[in-house]
Amino acid sequence: CLLIIVPFLYTELSMSKKILGSIIVILIIAVGFYYQSQLSDDDGVKKVGFIYVGPVTDFGWTYEHDQGRKAVVEAFGDAVETTYVESVSEGPDAERAITQMARDHDLIFTTSFGYMNPTIKVAEKFKKVKFEHATGYQRADNVATYAARFYEGRHLIGLIAGGMTQSNTIGYIASFPIPEVIRGINAAYLAATSVNPTVEFKIVWVYTWFDPGKEADAAKALIDQGADIIMQHTGSAAAMTTAEE
């Protein structure tokens, strides 16, 4: 079992990093467009802020966003100044953090789906500040959204999983039942069944983006249910660590 789980999980991490790497490109382009649009207004340093749902050391979603922030600094040099706040929970804490940042920033990236409503609410109060919200669907005159085709990577992972599984059971650790996550599950499942029509997916919802304890417990539960391959749509490496045990 472990011989199958561990290599696959590292394969998933590697492929996910390639997909998440597109975030770096998105951030650079977004800042570039913003900077060019503001050149006629003044030539001062633009302050760009980032609100993160997890720690920058999670080696996942937040880590890649912070790599994007660093790439922005490298690309634009002294023309921009960046700041970030990490581990901001979705809800009232997010609104407070975004509001505080909006008081002295020109462009703000709110990097989690659950920041959508707080972003829209704060944007109404700070019309001169531009906002970029990750994976959301609400927009305003000063709020744009960005995303990548993450489901394409999960489709490839599903193909691999469908061909590798020996127990015919694949476990999936899911965060929240929102379109982004459900789309990923569907992509992986459709791909897996295209090469192995009898494969079964078992899903555990953890209702968090980053909680190593819950993710580890979910992985253990899926392994106990016969899964020999584990996928995840969460932010920590806890599932991989559990699979190695």
Language-model features, listed with the residues they occupy:
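Secretory targeting signatures
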Residues: 1-39
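A residue-level marker of the well-folded mature domains of exported/periplasmic proteins
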Residues: 20, 35-245
